[in-house]
Amino acid sequence: MAHKKGSGSTRNGRDSNSKRLGVKKYGGEQVTAGNILIRQRGTKVKPGQNVGKGKDDTLFSLIDGFVLFEKSNQKQKTISVYSAKK
């Protein structure tokens, strides 16, 4: 029996922890000020009305209201929060 591991097995076996990115509040959902709406890397979705952007590109609600996803042009999505449901 070998007393040393094979060269491949000691170099493998690492993986990073998941970062739990993605949409946290969906369209039509009620939110309060400060609720996280989307966790993302880069601005896949841009902040719209009443939505702030953190330094890690996290989008969060600035007011109490309802979430609405919109398209600002053909490609770019935005997320807004309105006080009354539209």
From Swiss-Prot:
Biological process terms in GO annotation: translation
Entry-linked InterPro entries: Ribosomal_bL27, Ribosomal_bL27_CS
Coiled coil: none
Residues passing through the membrane, by range: none
UniProt keyword list: Chloroplast, Plastid, Ribonucleoprotein, Ribosomal protein
Main location: plastid
Superkingdom, taxonomy of origin: Eukaryota
Region: Disordered, residue numbers: 1-27
GO molecular function (one): structural constituent of ribosome
Name of one Pfam family that matches: Ribosomal_L27
GO cellular component: chloroplast; cytosolic large ribosomal subunit
Subcellular location: Plastid, Chloroplast
Family assignment from sequence similarity: Belongs to the bacterial ribosomal protein bL27 family.
Record's protein name: Large ribosomal subunit protein bL27c
Gene behind this protein: rpl27
